[in-house]
């Protein structure tokens, strides 16, 4: 989750034309890169987070998809996103990309100024990783409290026909979601779309950072490793992260690093993420009225005690 918002506008439904059926179709149409490394970017409203801007994890997923034109494959890979500036929806922008060996880099530009870039590195991940899953990465036996839903966010928008329509929960230990992805996020053979991991884990990371720092904010560095993108995942999945793993990046505590994972129903680790969250009162000023209006007062006081009065 990244960028700015307006609480009044956030509930406004998109008036854009109906989006295609699957997230793969939408993203392929939004980010078109030619084999010469040049292309165009035009994201529909269905890919937004806060009103008017593209979802942060969605941006990484879009640039991963665009990198296919440069020869980037569908196997295990690491996605490294640098969200320098918010990227507007329904605005024609430029794409530039290049590839060298197993690494492809794609950048979104506005009047030659970079807004966001992502690197797709297939050489950074082994084909059959054996990374251990922390015992605390589970939704089993957890109840917790619900997160507020939005209307049109790609991840948590209750009225976004394309979106995950995600209901995150939290407790004293961390943040999680346990659900079966909708048909628009699935492909043949019970495979989940590769866009799901960056979108979902970015959302988990935002809440991990916000609930540890007790402030609103944004994510600006997104690293997601797709460990088993070709695996069949027929049942529900779990996305989870722990507050204990949220740590300051710098001495001034301006940036905080989060850690989260995506697991199949049998506990198989599908993806891991290391995502940087930047909190601040300037973000809270714009975001808290939205959350307060959509959250039970007692729950809101637990989440953001400094803004509960």
Where do the language-model regions lie?
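Non-catalytic linker/capping segments at the edges of enzyme domains
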Residues: 1-43, 103, 118-188, 289-309
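Ordered, small/hydrophobic-rich secondary-structure cores
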Residues: 21-105, 109
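Short histidine-centered catalytic/ligand-binding loop motif
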Residues: 46-53, 183-196
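Active-site helix/loop of acyl-thioester processing domains in fatty-acid/polyketide metabolism
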Residues: 53-76, 193-217
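Hydrophobic beta-sheet segments that form the core/acyl-binding groove
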Residues: 74-114, 224-268
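A structural microfeature
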Residues: 114-118, 270-273
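A short acidic/small-residue loop/turn micro-motif
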Residues: 122-124, 277-280
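Mixed-charge, glycine-accented linear interaction segment located at domain edges/termini
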Residues: 263, 269-276, 282-286
């Amino acid at each position: 989750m990244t960028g700015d918002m307006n609480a009044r506008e956030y509930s406004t439904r998109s008036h854009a034309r109906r989006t295609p059926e699957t997230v793969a179709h939408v993203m392929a149409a939004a980010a078109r890169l030619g084999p010469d490394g040049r292309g165009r970017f035009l994201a529909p409203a269905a890919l937004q987070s806060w009103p008017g801007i593209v979802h942060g994890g969605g941006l990484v997923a879009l640039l991963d998809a665009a990198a296919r034109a440069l020869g980037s494959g569908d196997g295990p890979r690491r996605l490294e996103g640098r969200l320098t500036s918010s990227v507007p929806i329904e605005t024609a922008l430029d794409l530039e990309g290049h590839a060298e060996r197993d690494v492809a880099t794609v950048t979104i530009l506005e009047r030659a100024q970079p807004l966001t870039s992502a690197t797709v590195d297939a050489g950074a991940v082994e084909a059959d990783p054996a990374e251990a899953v922390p015992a605390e990465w589970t939704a089993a036996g957890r109840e917790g409290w619900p997160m507020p839903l939005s209307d049109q966010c790609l991840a948590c928008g209750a009225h976004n026909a394309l979106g995950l329509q995600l209901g995150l929960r939290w407790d004293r230990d961390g943040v999680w979601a346990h659900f079966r992805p909708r048909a628009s996020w699935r492909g043949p053979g019970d495979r989940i779309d590769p866009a799901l991991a960056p979108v979902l884990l970015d959302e988990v990371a935002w809440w991990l950072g916000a609930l540890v720092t007790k402030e609103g904010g944004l994510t600006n560095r997104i690293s997601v490793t797709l460990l088993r993108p070709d695996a069949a995942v027929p049942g529900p999945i779990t996305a989870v992260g722990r507050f204990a793993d949220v740590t300051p990046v710098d001495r001034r505590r301006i940036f905080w690093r989060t850690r989260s994972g995506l697991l199949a129903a049998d506990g198989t680790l599908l993806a891991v993420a290391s995502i940087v969250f930047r909190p601040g009162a300037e973000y809270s000023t714009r975001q808290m009225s939205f959350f307060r209006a959509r959250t039970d007062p007692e729950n809101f006081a637990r989440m953001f005690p400094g803004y509960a009065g």
